Amino acid sequence: MGCAGGVNGLATAARLAAAEPGSRWLFVTIETCSISIRLDSDDPAAIVATALFGDGAAAAVVSTEGEGIAAIAGSGERMWPDTLGIMGWRVEDPGLAVVFDRAIPPFIETELANAVDDMLAVMGRSREEIDRLCCHPGGVKVIDAIEAAMELPVGTLDLERDVLRDCGNMSAPTVLFVLERLLERGLPQRVLMTAFGPGFTCAGMLLERP
């Protein structure tokens, strides 16, 4: 699932917990993105990956018991057809090759708002009811595109930029690093977690504070 795995994995843990009331599920996500470093390649995507990616791990416990930090109120995913060439990996003899298309930021800027609105509608919510996004910071231009698509003032996604600066893009765990910093600041009443991944996909999950 790539970068979308943090949101999708946590949503899966929530469904497993709901299927077994009283159970506790430990969700763990680990990514070693440094395997994308290719000293044998001068491909621009490989150079970007070397500069952008980092290794990381994150975990969260999901249960139907206790208040916790927030309730998972819903989740969803949008997959766009004929977009496999936008983002992903190729397996080559010397190692993994990253697929990054320049179309990613403009695609997000064009498509994200409708995808978010559709996911929220299924959850019985609207964009106006969301206090903050908690986004996977795929790159500086991706963060800029999210702010533009969602009509947010420039600089709104400050924690996303901080995590990207401090840790790099760690793929799936990265959005949980952003959530951690949001918790330290004080979690708003309703937060929509989002992440993009190969497919091209957008995963979303709604958190609501008790």
Residue positions per predicted region:
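Active-site-adjacent elements of ketosynthase-type condensing enzymes
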Residues: 27-48, 74-93, 139-148, 169-177
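Conserved A3 ("GATE") glycine/threonine-rich loop of ANL adenylate-forming enzymes
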Residues: 3, 32-33, 54-55, 199
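Condensing-enzyme catalytic core mediating Claisen C-C bond formation in acyl metabolism
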Residues: 39-110, 114-117, 196, 208-210
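Alpha-helical metal-binding/catalytic segments enriched in His/Glu/Asp
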Residues: 6, 10-11, 31, 59-61
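Short coil/turn connectors at secondary-structure junctions
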Residues: 19-25, 47-48, 56-57, 66-69, ...
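Short beta-strand segments
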Residues: 24-31, 62, 193-197
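Claisen-condensing/thiolase-fold acyl-transfer catalytic domains that form or cleave C-C bonds
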Residues: 1-18, 109, 113, 127, ...
